Amino acid sequence: MQPKILIRDENAFGASGHSGKRLSPSWRGATHIVKLWDQNEYPQLAANEFFCLTAARKCGLDVSPYRLAEDGMALVIDRFDLRMDGTYRGLEDFCVLNARRTDEKYRGSYESQVMKRFTQFANSTHVNEDMEKLFTLIALNCAIRNGNAHLKNFAIVYDDVHGEARLAPVYDLVTTSVYIPKDCLALTLDGSTKWPAAKDLRKFGETRAGCTPAKVRRIFQRIAEALQETSREVNSYAQEHPAFAEVGQLMLREWDEGVNASLRG
C-alpha cells in the first residue's frame, strides 16, 4: 500500500489576509495529494514518478501540476478533479467502469477493458482526441516499462452525469522494472502480458484507437523524443543528487530498451 496524504492549501481559492502557503492535512476540500514511499523497498520512487510524469507532459498528455520535494522523498500533485469553487468533478476509474472490484484491477485487456470501454462512456465531442491520448499513454507505459498500468490507473472525469466525459489527466506513472526486473504489462495486449513489439503496438493503435499508420508513427516519434529530452534532465538531477544516480541509470536503460523494442523494433 502506497501512503498518500491529502492536504489543503488554504490560499488555493483566493483567500485573502494570508501571506505564504498555509497547508493542512484534510480529506475535505483537499487541494493536493502528497505521495510517500518506503525508501527501503522502492528507493527514489518519488523522483522516478516525477520524471515519468515529465515525459508524459512532453508527449503532449494532460498532467496535473506536480513537484518533487527538495529531499526527493515525496511527490506533491495538484488534484485534477477540483473545481475553482472548491467542489469536485466526477471521477471514475476503469475498475468502476468495468464493474470490477479493486482486487480485480489486473484482470482484463487494454483492447476491451480500456479502449473499448472508454468508447462506451466517452460521450464528448473530443472522443477522437481522447482516444489518441489514451493510445499515447498506453504506448508510453510500454516504452518506460511501467508494469502498473492497471484498471485503476486510467480514469474519466465529468462535470455532470449527463454531460461529456473526458479522459482524466495522467497519474501513477512509474518505471516499475527498476524494482521488478521481470515485470510485464499489467493487462494483456494481443492476449499477452509481454512487452509488445512495435508491430503489435502499431496494430493496436490502428485497430483500437482508430489512428492512421502515419499518426501512429508520429505518436511513437513524439514519445521517443520526449524520453530523450527527459533523459537529459534525469542525468542532470542524478549529478546533483548522487543518491538517485543508480535508479536514474536503471531508468534510462529501461527507457532505451522500451523505445527500441516497443516503438522501433
Feature-to-residue mapping (PLM):
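Anionic ligand-binding catalytic core segments
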Residues: M1-L151, A155-G265
